[in-house]
């Protein structure tokens, strides 16, 4: 009888060890190296945002359309602008010069959505109308403004960019108080039709 108990114990121990290994190996399959994808199209563009401040109506390309209670629609609210909604119709250029000929328009909105730091949520389109590119690209995503380079998604497009998808790396290229900023937008499309 003692031999049977020892055999049963060893068999159960072996079975538990085997099942534990089987479970662990199926829960964590071996990692495969991700295939490095090459963009099918890449563009670098700049858009220039001039926020209306009550004194620059002729040059303003953006306006505050929503503000927290007690704030006005001329000046951005509070320390981190939490609750402000800004719509824009900004020129897009091929270089960082505000006075360069525009190749299109950036149109959409951004919402300052964090109380404790500069952070916004973006939803906008680039409408391009040049000999090189005709069509639109649609962008959406969170923008942690204080980070130098941040990624937002390209969720679609029309014309030359029909059903395009990819990533846009944005960086604040210039910033002049609460009135003007320029974003460098490095667009990498991974789905092109």
UniProtKB/Swiss-Prot annotation:
Induction context: Transiently induced after wounding and by jasmonic acid (MeJA). After an exposition to UV-light, first transiently induced before fading out.
Signal peptide (from-to): 1-29
Glycosylation sites: 59, 129
Pathway: Aromatic compound metabolism; phenylpropanoid biosynthesis
Tissue: Expressed in rhizomes, stems, and leaves.
Main location: secreted
Biotechnology: Combinatorially expression of Sinopodophyllum hexandrum (mayapple) genes of the podophyllotoxin pathway (e.g. DIR, PLR, SDH, CYP719A23, OMT3, CYP71CU1, OMT1, 2-ODD, CYP71BE54 and CYP82D61) in Nicotiana benthamiana (tobacco) results in the production of the chemotherapeutic compound etoposide.
Record flagged with keyword Glycoprotein: yes
Job description of the protein: Dirigent proteins impart stereoselectivity on the phenoxy radical-coupling reaction, yielding optically active lignans from two molecules of coniferyl alcohol in the biosynthesis of lignans, flavonolignans, and alkaloids and thus plays a central role in plant secondary metabolism. Also involved in the biosynthesis of etoposide, a chemotherapeutic compound of the topoisomerase inhibitor family.
Name assigned to this protein: Dirigent protein
Gene giving rise to this polypeptide: DIR
């Amino acid at each position: 009888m003692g031999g049977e108990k020892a055999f049963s114990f060893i068999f159960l121990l072996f079975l538990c060890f085997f099942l534990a290994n089987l479970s662990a190996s199926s829960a964590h399959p071996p990692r495969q190296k991700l295939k490095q994808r090459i963009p099918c199209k890449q563009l670098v563009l700049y858009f220039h945002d001039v926020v209306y401040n009550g004194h620059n109506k002729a040059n303003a390309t953006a306006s505050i359309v929503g503000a927290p209670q007690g704030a006005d629609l001329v000046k951005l609210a509070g320390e981190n602008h939490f609750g402000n909604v800004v719509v824009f119709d900004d020129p897009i250029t091929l270089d960082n010069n505000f006075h360069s000929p525009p190749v299109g328009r950036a149109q959409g909105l951004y919402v300052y959505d964090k109380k404790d730091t500069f952070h916004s949520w973006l939803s906008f389109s680039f409408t391009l109308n040049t000999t090189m590119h005709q069509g639109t690209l649609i962008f959406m995503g969170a923008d942690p403004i204080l980070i130098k380079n941040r990624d937002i998604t390209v969720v679609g497009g029309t014309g030359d960019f029909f059903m395009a998808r990819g990533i846009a790396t944005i960086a604040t290229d210039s910033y002049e108080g609460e009135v003007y900023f320029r974003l460098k937008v490095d667009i990498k499309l991974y789905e092109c039709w």
